[in-house]
From Swiss-Prot:
Annotated SUPFAM superfamilies: omega toxin-like
Entry's Gene Ontology molecular function annotations: potassium channel regulator activity; toxin activity
Similarity comment text for this entry: Belongs to the neurotoxin 11 (kappa toxin) family.
Keyword annotations from UniProtKB, A to Z: Calcium-activated potassium channel impairing toxin, Disulfide bond, Ion channel impairing toxin, Knottin, Neurotoxin, Potassium channel impairing toxin, Secreted, Toxin
Intrachain S-S bonds: 4-18, 11-23, 14-15, 17-34
Keyword Amino-acid biosynthesis assigned: no
Name by which UniProt lists this protein: Lambda-hexatoxin-Hf1a
GO CC aspect terms: extracellular region
Primary role: This excitatory toxin inhibits insect calcium-activated potassium (KCa) channels (Slo-type).
Compartment list: Secreted
Chain segments annotated as transmembrane: none
Length: 37
């Protein structure tokens, strides 16, 4: 089954950010990342 995306990893459609993190971005490189809340 899909797993959650950990902090400081790119947000992925398959795998929501893990509890305590949320998708932030996009950053200067154009990628959004899961970051600690």
């Amino acid at each position: 089954s899909p797993t959650c995306t950990g902090a400081d990893r790119p947000c992925a459609a398959c795998c929501p950010c893990c509890p305590g993190t949320s998708c932030k971005g996009p950053e200067p490189n154009g990628v959004s990342y899961c970051r600690n809340d």
